[in-house]
């Protein structure tokens, strides 16, 4: 069982967007065969807040699309709270335009990206990236949001 707690203070998300986030999350938790009750927080923010967080925690002074803070410790979950994801709504919009695909696909991609980081996946090395992005594309496909080439 999983629960996503969505914090959207600026009311960027529609009900349809929230449903999509829950659908993507559910598919990941099914695909990863997670059994325990797991909760994660998703904070929908603007580019200004994204830039502040990116500068504070990554020492990079520009907005980023998604930042995850995992509470996993060496593959062990000490609490039901898996972690926190901060997602820039403005980046979802601009990157959907930039990559010439739908807002929904970009939202699904970035939510899945954040969740997989919470689960301990990374993309620093080529072999890690292949695994992580492969999982993301599989979830997008299962959710009807296209494949790797879309």
UniProtKB/Swiss-Prot annotation:
The keyword S-adenosyl-L-methionine does not apply. It comes from Malacoplasma penetrans (strain HF-2) (Mycoplasma penetrans). Binds 1 zinc ion. Its main location: cytoplasm. Gene3D superfamilies: Metalloproteases ('zincins'), catalytic domain. GO terms for biological process: rRNA processing. This is Endoribonuclease YbeY. Pfam families: YbeY (PF02130). Keywords: Cytoplasm, Endonuclease, Hydrolase, Metal-binding, Nuclease, Ribosome biogenesis, rRNA processing, Zinc. It is an enzyme of class 3 (hydrolase). HAMAP family: Endoribonucl_YbeY. It comes from the Bacteria. It is found in: Cytoplasm. Belongs to the endoribonuclease YbeY family. Single strand-specific metallo-endoribonuclease involved in late-stage 70S ribosome quality control and in maturation of the 3' terminus of the 16S rRNA. Its EC number is 3.1.-.-. One of its GO terms (cellular component) is cytoplasm. InterPro entries: MetalPrtase_cat_dom_sf_prd (IPR023091), YbeY (IPR002036), YbeY_CS (IPR020549). Zn(2+) binds at residues 113, 117, 123. Its cofactor is Zn(2+).
């Amino acid at each position: 069982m999983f629960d996503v707690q969505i914090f959207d203070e600026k009311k960027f998300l529609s009900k349809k967007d929230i449903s999509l986030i829950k659908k993507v999350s559910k598919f990941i938790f099914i695909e990863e065969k997670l059994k325990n009750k797991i909760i994660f927080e998703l904070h929908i923010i603007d580019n200004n807040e994204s830039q502040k967080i990116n500068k504070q925690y990554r020492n990079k002074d520009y907005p980023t699309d998604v930042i995850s803070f995992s509470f996993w410790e060496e593959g062990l979950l000490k609490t039901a709270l898996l972690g926190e994801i901060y997602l820039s709504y403005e980046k979802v919009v601009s990157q959907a335009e930039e990559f010439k695909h739908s807002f929904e696909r970009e939202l699904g991609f970035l939510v899945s990206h954040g969740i997989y980081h919470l689960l301990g996946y990374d993309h620093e090395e080529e072999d890690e990236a292949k695994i992580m992005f492969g999982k993301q594309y599989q979830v997008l496909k299962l959710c009807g949001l296209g494949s790797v080439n879309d």
